[in-house]
Amino acid sequence: MKSVRYLIGLFAFIACYYLLPISTRLLWQPDETRYAEISREMLASGDWIVPHLLGLRYFEKPIAGYWINSIGQWLFGANNFGVRAGVIFATLLTAALVTWFTLRLWRDKRLALLAAVIYLSLFIVYAIGTYAVLDPFIAFWLVAGMCSFWLAMQAQTWKGKSAGFLLLGITCGMGVMTKGFLALAVPVLSVLPWVATQKRWKDLFIYGWLAVISCILTVLPWGLAIAQREPDFWHYFFWVEHIQRFAMDDAQHRAPFWYYLPVIIAGSLPWLGLLPGALYAGWQNRKHSATVYLLSWTIMPLLFFSVAKGKLPTYILSCFAPLAMLMAHYALLAAKNNPLALRINGWINIAFGVTGIIATFVVSPWGPMNTPVWQTFESYKVFCAWSIFSLWAFFGWYTLTNVEKTWPFAALCPLGLALLVGFSIPDRVMEGKHPQFFVEMTQESLQPSRYILTDSVGVAAGLAWSLQRDDIIMYRQTGELKYGLNYPDAKGRFVSGDEFANWLNQHRQEGIITLVLSVDRDEDINSLAIPSADVIDRQERLVLIQYRPK
C-alpha cells in the first residue's frame, strides 16, 4: 500500500508541475517561438530532412530535436502545450532513467523514487524542462549514455558488454543529431576518470569500437540525406556552430570561467542545502565505484563547459541527473545520522521565500520604486507572485517540523511557481517577450496583411507561428537568419532600412503592408525614419505600423 501511495503522489506531482499549468504560459521569444515555428513548418511542408525557419534554411542545429517537437505539435496541436510536449516528455524520460539507475546502483526503491523527485523539482531542471528548447533532449541522450556505459562495463558476458556499447553508440548518435558533436565530447570526458580509477581500459578498447560503429550508423542516413540536399550544411554546422561558438575569441555568449557557479547554486534550489554535503560525501566515498562514476558525470561536463568560451545555463542540464542521485543518497544518510544539512536546506528555502516576498513588494506598485515592474491594474499578478514565494517559504518551514521525516516535502517549494508563474508575468514583459500577447491585441490588423515585416527574428517566428504563415520578411536586421538569407532563392526576404521606402512604393498596391518593430520603452516612434503610415498601434515594446493600398 505504501508503494501505491508513493506512485499516486508521484503522478500527482508530475501533473501539477509538468502537465496542468503548461498551457497557461505564453511562448517566450526568441527560443520557444523559434523552435515552435521550425516544427510547424516541418509539419506543414513534410520536409523532415532540412530544417527551415520562416521558409529559410536554418542550419544552427541538426534535425532530431525538431522531429520530437514536430511530433508534439502533431499529437497535441499548435498550442502552448503541443510546443512544449517534446521537452516535457524528454524530461520525464530522464527522470525515469534516474529512477532506474538509482535502483540499480543501491537497490532501494525509496531512494530511487526520491532521486527522481529531487531531479524533477530542481529549479534548473523545471525551468528548462518546461521550456521549448533542445537542451532537455540532449540531456536525455547524455543520461541514457551514462546508463548504457555503466550497463556495458558491469555486464559479465561478451553479449551484455556488446549490447551496452551498441546502445551507448545509439545514444551518442541521437545526441549528435540533436545538438551536434558535443554529444561525443561529454560522454568521453565523463567516463575517462572512472575508467582510469577502476583500471577498465581493456574493456573500453575491446568493445568501444562497437559504440563508434553504432553511432555512425545512427547518424549516417540523415547525415547523407542532408549532405545530398544541402552540401554546405556540415561545413557550416561544424565550423560556425561548434568551433566558433565555443572556442574562438568571438564565441557566442562569452562568459568567464566561474559563470556556472551561480547557475549551480540557483539551479539546485530547493535542494541547495544538500549540494555541498552530497559532493563532499561523494568524494569521501570515492572508493565506491558507483559514486566515482556519478561524480565524474557531474563534474567533468561542468569543467568542460566552464573552459569553453561560449556559455549558457542550459548547457549543464545533464549534470543535474547524477547530482540528484548523489543528493538523494546523501539526504537519506543525513536523515538517519545527522540531519543538520536537511535543517539548513529548510532554512535556505524559508530565506528564499521571504526574500522573494520582500522583493515582490519593492517592485510592486505599492513599493518605493518610481517605475514598478507591475502596474496598479495588475495587482492580481502581484498577489500571484506573493503566493509563489509564500508557498516556497511555507514548505521550507514545514520540512523543519519533523525534519527526519518531512524533508522530502522541499520538493513542493516550487509548487506555487509551477502553478502561478504564467499568471504573474508583468504586462511590460509580456509585451516584449510574448509575441502571442501582441498578436492577440492586434489580430484584426495582422490577419489581412499581404506582407508582414519585422526587425526581430524571435518576433518574426512568433508572428509566423501564431498566424500560421512562414512568409514574414526581415526588416533592417537579419540576426540568426543571415546565413539562410544568403541563398539566391531567399531574395526578397530581407528589406534594409534604406531600401524600405522604394520597396513600399513597389508593393503597396498588392495589399496591406504591416511593419512590426521592437522599440525601447521611452523611444519616440514619431522619430522613426520610415514613410508616414496609415495606422500606428503601440503595445509598449512592440509597434504595429500599417500601410494600406493607395
From Swiss-Prot:
Keywords: Cell inner membrane, Cell membrane, Glycosyltransferase, Lipid A biosynthesis, Lipid biosynthesis, Lipid metabolism, Lipopolysaccharide biosynthesis, Membrane, Transferase, Transmembrane, Transmembrane helix. Its EC number is 2.4.2.43. The chain crosses the membrane at residues 7-27, 81-101, 113-133, 134-154, 165-185, 204-224, 263-283, 288-308, 315-335, 346-366, 382-402, 406-426. One of its GO terms (cellular component) is plasma membrane. This is Undecaprenyl phosphate-alpha-4-amino-4-deoxy-L-arabinose arabinosyl transferase. HAMAP family: ArnT_transfer (MF_01165). It comes from Escherichia coli O127:H6 (strain E2348/69 / EPEC). GO terms for biological process: lipid A biosynthetic process; lipopolysaccharide biosynthetic process; protein O-linked glycosylation; response to iron(III) ion. The keyword tRNA-binding does not apply. GO terms for molecular function: 4-amino-4-deoxy-L-arabinose transferase activity; mannosyltransferase activity. It is a multi-pass membrane protein. Its main location: membrane. Belongs to the glycosyltransferase 83 family. It catalyses: 4-amino-4-deoxy-alpha-L-arabinopyranosyl di-trans,octa-cis-undecaprenyl phosphate + lipid IVA = lipid IIA + di-trans,octa-cis-undecaprenyl phosphate. It is found in: Cell inner membrane. Pathway: Lipopolysaccharide metabolism; 4-amino-4-deoxy-beta-L-arabinose-lipid A biosynthesis. Catalyzes the transfer of the L-Ara4N moiety of the glycolipid undecaprenyl phosphate-alpha-L-Ara4N to lipid A. The modified arabinose is attached to lipid A and is required for resistance to polymyxin and cationic antimicrobial peptides.
